[in-house]
Curated annotation (Swiss-Prot):
SUPFAM superfamilies referenced in this protein's UniProt entry, alphabetically: Flavoproteins
Co-factor(s): FMN
Protein name, per record: FMN-dependent NADH:quinone oxidoreductase
Binding annotation for FMN: 10, 16-18
InterPro entries: Flavodoxin_fold, Flavoprotein-like_sf, FMN-dep_NADH:Q_OxRdtase_AzoR1, NADH:quinone_OxRdtase_FMN_depd
Primary gene name: azoR
Family: Belongs to the azoreductase type 1 family.
Length: 197
């Protein structure tokens, strides 16, 4: 049985293009015995990391206080989702040239030294190798892959930092708010079909 972790982040719900693309990709990648774990970051259920959560996340499980166990519970769950997945599909919009704040909160939460990456004499090394990730990107005005797109390269780098180096991006071209928006969305859907052919 294979496992797909489907992460979405758009606040636009059913109107979201990035969510529609990622959902289509998950559907096409899924087989009869595929387990799909869904995590909707737009629900704002991931708190931002503060000093107490940071300390709890770094504490060995057996040494955590009851308060630390509670603070670290969401991080444990999110990390377990990543560890269990063979494939990660992220549907992420570009907001103000970068990732939604909830995606950054997710990243800060799952980046745990000794668990998802480790420090070595030659530098940090990811511990989640052997997985493949797909990022479906939608942008209203920021051209995906341009010098003002700080989302796509950052997210690819972060996944690589965790050891997920095989990352494929499917994106709407040049922003969809201007002329030809519907054609750009249709083209992105065709990309999904080709990726999962």
């Amino acid at each position: 049985m294979s496992t797909i972790l489907h992460i979405t982040a758009s606040i636009r719900g059913d109107e979201s293009i990035s969510r529609a693309l990622s959902s289509k990709l998950v559907e096409r990648l899924s087989g009869t015995d595929t387990k799909v774990i869904t995590r909707d970051l737009s629900q704002n259920d991931i708190p931002y990391v503060d000093a107490d959560r940071f300390a709890a996340n770094l504490s060995p499980y057996t040494e955590r206080s009851p308060e630390q166990q509670e603070l670290a519970a969401i991080a444990d769950t999110l990390i377990e989702e990543l560890q269990a997945a063979d494939t990660i599909v992220l549907g992420v919009p570009i907001y103000n040239f970068s990732v939604p704040a909830t995606v950054k909160a997710w990243a800060d939460t799952v980046a745990r030294a000794g668990t998802t990456f480790e420090y070595t004499p030659t530098g940090p090394k990811g511990k989640l190798d052997g997985k493949k990730a797909y990022i479906t990107v939608a942008s209203g005005g920021t051209p995906v892959g341009s010098e003002v797109d700080f989302m796509s390269p950052w997210l690819k780098f972060f996944l690589g930092f965790l050891g997920i180096s095989e990352v494929e991006v499917v994106a709407t071209a040049d922003g969809i708010m201007g002329e030809g928006g519907e054609e750009k969305i249709a083209s992105a859907h065709k990309q999904v079909e080709q990726v999962a052919a």
